[in-house]
Regions:
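Flavin (FAD/FMN) cofactor-binding and adjacent substrate-gating region
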Residues: 1-77
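A short, glycine/Asx- and small/polar-enriched loop/turn
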Residues: 18-21, 48-55, 96-103, 112, ...
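Helical element adjacent to the flavin cofactor pocket in flavoenzyme catalytic cores
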Residues: 28-29, 53, 57-116, 120
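C-terminal catalytic lobe of FAD-dependent flavoproteins
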Residues: 213-296
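Flavin-binding catalytic cores
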Residues: 148-152, 193-232
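Short acidic/His/Gly/Ser-rich catalytic and metal-binding motifs that mark active-site loops
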Residues: 182, 188-193
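Flavin-dependent oxidoreductases
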Residues: 94-180
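General small-molecule cofactor/ligand-binding pocket signal
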Residues: 38-40, 85-87, 226-229
Length: 296
């Protein structure tokens, strides 16, 4: 894929002096499995960053950035060449997911029948489970994209940065020398509530965007003229054990779900794609037990 994939170092840090030993242990654990990283402390490496920290793990090849739009296009095109059929503008408005054959009704009132349906619509899939007691927690995460900056002074190698808070704040550069910062999460108690359905210019959303801009300016005072270019927010779903939900649900026996909820959605989605493919092929992978619905 010509998606400008670029390896980047990453920095996980804490400002809590009580967590210095934890960061040291984390660094040793990463090194033990072959990850090229080192422990930074305020005494040894504070000059690498313009914001204060007590300790952190600096992984030299621990992350990467890509052009996600181009990657998605290339991925679809690659699979079309292998026989995948893609139907754009096909909104499903009704369904019957029986165990023998699944029937989907489109917005244009066409009928699609299939032996199996795989649902991997991310947070939108929660609509399928509104009748259940929630097995997840919801929050809304905010992010801003700045206008391109002239330099990254006070920011070692323009690495990807994440703090150790829960919820956490992250920062990363873009290929065009802009900055993305995300965080300032708001908890959601009700899918029909205000926070769950707010628009981009909701007063509370604007407040969170402003907080993010203030934070990046405080962290990097040597970077001049940091200004917001655009902003966005979205739902974030977590689970009690931090693991995704992959496989079949008892209410929808004609469907598979690949819901990469939790703290590692990209990896979970890849695992789900592999396991579901194996199950459809009749291989019955035992790992599906780990990610099943109704596990707690």
């Amino acid at each position: 894929s010509n998606c400008d994939f670029t390896f980047k170092p990453c920095f996980l840090y804490t400002q809590d002096p009580r967590k210095v030993d934890y960061m040291a242990d984390e660094c040793k654990s990463r090194q033990a499995i072959g990850i090229h990283c080192e422990l930074f402390t305020s005494e040894t490496h504070q000059n690498e960053f313009s914001f204060n920290f007590e300790a952190g793990v600096y992984s030299h090849y621990g992350a990467a950035i890509i052009n996600p739009v181009q990657f998605t296009r290339d991925l679809i095109e690659y699979n079309v060449k292998k026989g995948l059929q893609v139907f754009e503008n096909t909104n499903i408005v009704d369904y019957n997911l029986s165990s023998r054959q699944s029937v989907l009704i489109t917005e244009q009132e066409f009928t699609i029948t299939a032996d199996k349906v795989i649902i991997c619509t991310g947070y939108d899939a929660l609509e399928w489970f509104k009748h259940e007691k929630p097995f997840y927690t919801l929050s809304r995460r905010f992010a801003i994209l700045t206008k391109p900056v002239e330099n990254f002074h006070g920011w070692k190698e323009a690495c990807i940065i994440r703090d150790d808070q829960d919820p956490y704040t992250y920062l990363r550069p873009t290929l065009s020398n802009s900055i993305i910062i995300g965080g300032e999460d708001l908890e959601i108690d009700d899918l029909d509530g205000e926070v769950a359905n707010m628009g981009d210019r909701h007063p509370l959303a604007l407040q969170q965007y402003h907080q993010l801009l203030r934070r990046v300016r405080r962290m990097f005072p040597q970077i001049e003229n940091i200004k917001t270019d655009c902003w966005f927010h979205g739902l974030f779903v977590d689970t009690k054990d931090g693991l995704p939900f992959i496989g079949k649900h008892p209410d929808y026996p004609g469907a598979y779900f690949n819901l990469g909820y939790g703290s590692n959605g990209i990896l979970y989605s890849l695992i789900g794609a592999k396991l579901i493919s194996q199950d459809v092929a009749g291989k019955n992978p035992k790992e599906l037990e780990i990610f099943k619905f109704n596990r707690y």
